[in-house]
Amino acid sequence: NEVDFDFWRDFRKAVRSEKEDAYILGEIWHDSMPWLRGDQFDAVMNYPFLTAILEMFAKNTITPTQFAEKMTKVYHMYPHTVNMAAFNLIGSHDTPRILTECANNLDKIKQIFTILLTFTGTPCLYYGDEIGLDGEQDPGCRKCMPWEDENQDLELRKHVKSLINLRKEHKVLANEGDLLFVAHDPDVVMYKRESSDSLAYVCINLGKQSKSISLEEWKNA
């Protein structure tokens, strides 16, 4: 982001002249709006999304209510057209594996993937996270992909595949629906996705006991 704006404008024109649907992704750690006005980048890496995920599920430093507040802020940082292309990530080649961050807690990993794949934006899966690959900082997070089924967490892989299929089948879970967090229980992260013709509810139970959620409360939210 130290490169002049005019360079990126010329870069975009050159790239799009070769491939009209090329996806131009930038890496910026602060307010990215100056690069996201339609003449430079299509999206940037959504680090505020990752930060909120880690604070909630890995570090346990925020409550579900605070998580909802942070994610709502993430959602409203940019216009909806920008959010639809947002590069939502839960790990990369520069960070410890999400499984390692969460102390190998697979229940938390499933919950994180549920949020990732029902949130507005472009979900990014770093290779191996979907089959339970672990690892600390580089080089631990860059180990080779284990292709054999016996070396993969097949239950986690099945969970991720089912979420991907849900996102494909129900566009309201992708980018056609608005997103609204609703707080009715201190142990549950809840939000709804709503479009002109569809409505979906996402509930993440962070407690140890089962929960009952009233749809009437959702409708009145």
Identify the meaning behind each predicted range.
Residues N1-A221:
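Active-site and adjacent substrate-binding regions of carbohydrate-active enzymes
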